[in-house]
Amino acid sequence: MKYIIIGMHCAGKQEVADILENKGIKCGRQFTNLENTFAANIYNGGNYEQYTMKDVNEIFENNAYIFMHEFPWGNELNFSPIKYYEGLSLYEFENNDVFVMSPHQLFSISPASIKDDVCFIWMDNTKKERLNRYYTEKRTYSFSNREEIESKDMNSFVKFLYGFDKSRVLYFTNEDPARVAAIIYSLIKYPDLINIYTEAYN
């Protein structure tokens, strides 16, 4: 079973993954060819794997990715004409258990490309809660720009989320990331709990 934590920016997705990783759970990292200074300080807390453009081209040519697309916040990167990409390699997906994605990234995936059983952890936090995290963590990207882009995906998000074969969904709103991490951890250790949890949290 693969566990994919889904939510808009500032929902606490990465905090959940960090807690799990500290407990020994294997968490996959996305890649980007965006320079480390920008990836670390502005976009994803340094949680991307840094790849060269050559690496990105090889992944693309070998079709060795779960998703890959041009970096969606390119309008904020006006310092260079270089194209930047982000994605999740097939190797990372096959060798880890937990992943973090935005709705925008999930829409880049063909449901047929995922053969494993999947449990989506949907962190549907309110704008107020996400704004609080944005200011508390002193994030520096444009909240309104990110909100505008990600909000476009939400209208068809629910239907798409349930379109994956062999998928389960756990839904949380404004939940403490530590509690979400504890539930994922228990599911990884005791997979038979999945039916109880999906019935309780849908």
Q: Each predicted region: which residue ranges?
A:
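Walker A/P-loop
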Residues: 14
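ATP-dependent small-molecule kinase phosphotransfer cores
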Residues: 30-97
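Conserved phosphate-donor/acceptor-positioning beta-strand/loop module used by diverse small-molecule
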Residues: 100-102, 114-135
